[in-house]
Structures are given as structure tokens and as C-alpha cells.
């Protein structure tokens, strides 16, 4: 995967807290499919053009910049698929107060406010850590930064769920976290391994860790699952329920063992 230092987070099984991996499948709406297909129609010829320029040893930086922008727009459609919120709603309803405790919820900027409102309606105590939540501003009375106050409340169980975006990927140590809900994922191995690593690090008294991963499925014309396979294989490989996950994906035409052989 190219990130061995981060892969150790979830491949060195003797040093992991036992965990169960739960893939949660969602689909794009018809409107989202149309947007995705429209971007694909722009991406395909551009990829061809760039490959042609490379072979001719001609500059292609301008085309590459346009292509990267299209890839980013396509990823945003998948990241913010509308059905994710409905599936999250059902997941939260299925979790009792004990099982929702010690949960990290990874969202996108677009999803953050909706998630906060959903948790509030379900009377789940929560706080969000964003780039705007200062890591340096100190409270005059406690001497703690805003982030430190949130993490203190999380460790003390006065907060059940902490929500975060990319700022949760580095520099924050939350050893008490046991559950990860990955609503918005990343295609960057370093980022998604760090997110999983937040909840599978061992800690005294920590019970089985749980990872809920939202995966967008396509159809014959939208092979979206292909983009997720390596990530799923890497996260699932040391899960206590690996064979169940393997069979689940096998039924969708994906052999996760192929990726085990690569790693």
C-alpha cells in the first residue's frame, strides 16, 4: 500500500485490541448516479489524453490538474451519498447506550451538522472536533484547550460520541475509543488506517472494538466497489469476523484474499 508505518496500526495482530468489522452498504440515488456518470464522461477522454502526452514526452500538468479536480468531485459524490444518513439513523437506533459509548464518528464537512442534529434528537451526548475547535486556546479556569476539554469529557463518559473530520486523523490520542463509525471515508491509506487505529489500540479494560464502515455500491455501469476493495481488505484482514466479511464480499464478486496475497 506504500504506507508500512501506518499499516502496522492494523496488521500487527498481537498488538491490537480484538475487533469486529461491519461493512454497511449504501447506494447512490438516481440523481447522484447521473452526476457520477457525467463526471466519468469527462474523466475517460482526459485519462486517454494524458497517457498519450506521456508517451509523446509532452507536458501534461495542465490536463492532470483538471483530472485531479474531476476525481475530487467524483469522490465527494460517494463520500456524501444521501442514503448514508438513513443507514446511520438505523444503526444508531440499533445501538443501546452502552454500545454507543466510546464512539468516534468520522464525517465529511457536508454531513457534520446533520449528524450532530441526529445525535441530539436521539439524546446521545456528543461533541465535534473540527479545525475551528482550537487546539491552542486555553480555558482560564481549567487550563485546558477546547480539544482537551472534549477529550476529557469523552474519557470520563460524559460524552458518548466525538465527531471529527480530517483533523481527527493525526495528533489526537484517544485510547478509550472503542467504536468507529466511518461515515465518510478516505481513499488515502494513511488516513483510513489512522482512523481505524484510533479504536483498535489496546487499553486497560477495553472490550471488543467495533468498526462500522459505510461502503457505496454501484451497479454494472458504476463499479464503485472496486475503489473500496483494498481498503476493506486491509481493515478486515485481522478482524475476528474476517471469514464472515470474506463471504459477504465474495457474494458481491470480490475476493478479499487476493489483496491478502498482495500485502
Regions found by a protein language model. Give the residues of each.
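Interdomain helical connector at the RecA1-RecA2 junction of SF1/SF2 helicase-like NTPases
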Residues: 1-101
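Alpha-helical scaffold elements adjacent to nucleotide-binding pockets in ATP/GTP-utilizing enzyme cores
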Residues: 35, 191-195, 227-231
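Conserved helicase ATPase core of P-loop NTP-dependent helicases/translocases
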Residues: 102-106, 112-170
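Cofactor-binding loop segments of dinucleotide-utilizing enzymes, especially the Rossmann-like FAD-
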Residues: 108, 131, 185, 214-216
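A short beta-strand element within the Helicase C-terminal
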Residues: 160-186, 191-194, 208-214
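Conserved segment of the helicase C-terminal RecA-like domain
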Residues: 198-228
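Long, largely alpha-helical accessory region at the distal end of helicase-like NTP-driven motors
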Residues: 222-263
Amino acid at each position: 500500500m506504500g504506507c508500512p508505518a501506518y499499516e502496522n496500526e492494523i496488521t500487527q495482530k498481537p498488538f491490537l485490541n480484538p475487533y469486529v468489522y461491519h461493512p454497511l452498504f449504501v447506494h447512490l440515488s438516481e440523481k447522484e448516479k447521473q452526476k457520477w456518470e457525467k463526471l466519468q464522461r469527462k474523466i475517460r477522454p482526459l485519462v486517454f489524453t494524458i497517457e498519450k502526452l506521456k508517451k509523446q514526452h509532452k507536458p501534461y500538468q495542465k490536463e492532470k490538474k483538471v483530472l485531479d479536480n474531476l476525481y475530487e468531485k467524483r469522490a465527494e459524490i460517494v463520500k456524501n451519498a444521501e442514503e448514508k444518513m438513513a443507514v446511520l439513523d438505523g444503526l444508531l437506533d440499533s445501538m443501546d447506550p452502552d454500545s454507543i459509548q466510546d464512539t468516534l464518528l468520522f464525517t465529511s464537512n457536508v454531513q457534520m451538522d446533520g449528524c450532530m442534529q441526529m445525535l441530539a434528537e436521539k439524546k446521545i451526548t456528543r461533541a465535534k472536533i473540527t479545525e475551528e475547535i482550537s487546539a491552542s486556546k486555553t480555558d482560564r479556569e481549567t487550563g485546558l484547550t477546547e480539544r482537551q476539554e472534549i477529550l476529557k469529557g469523552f474519557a470520563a463518559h460524559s460524552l458518548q460520541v466525538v465527531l471529527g473530520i480530517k483533523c481527527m486523523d493525526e495528533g489526537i490520542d484517544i485510547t478509550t475509543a472503542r467504536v468507529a463509525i466511518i461515515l465518510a471515508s478516505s481513499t488515502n491509506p494513511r488516513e483510513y488506517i489512522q482512523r481505524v487505529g484510533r479504536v483498535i489500540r489496546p487499553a486497560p479494560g477495553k472490550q471488543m472494538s467495533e468498526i462500522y464502515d459505510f461502503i457505496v455500491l454501484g451497479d454494472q455501469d458504476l463499479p464503485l466497489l472496486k475503489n473500496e476493495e483494498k481498503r476493506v481488505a486491509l481493515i478486515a484482514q485481522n478482524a475476528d469476523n474476517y471469514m464472515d466479511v470474506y463471504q459477504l464480499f465474495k457474494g458481491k464478486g470480490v475476493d478479499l484474499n487476493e489483496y491478502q496475497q498482495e500485502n
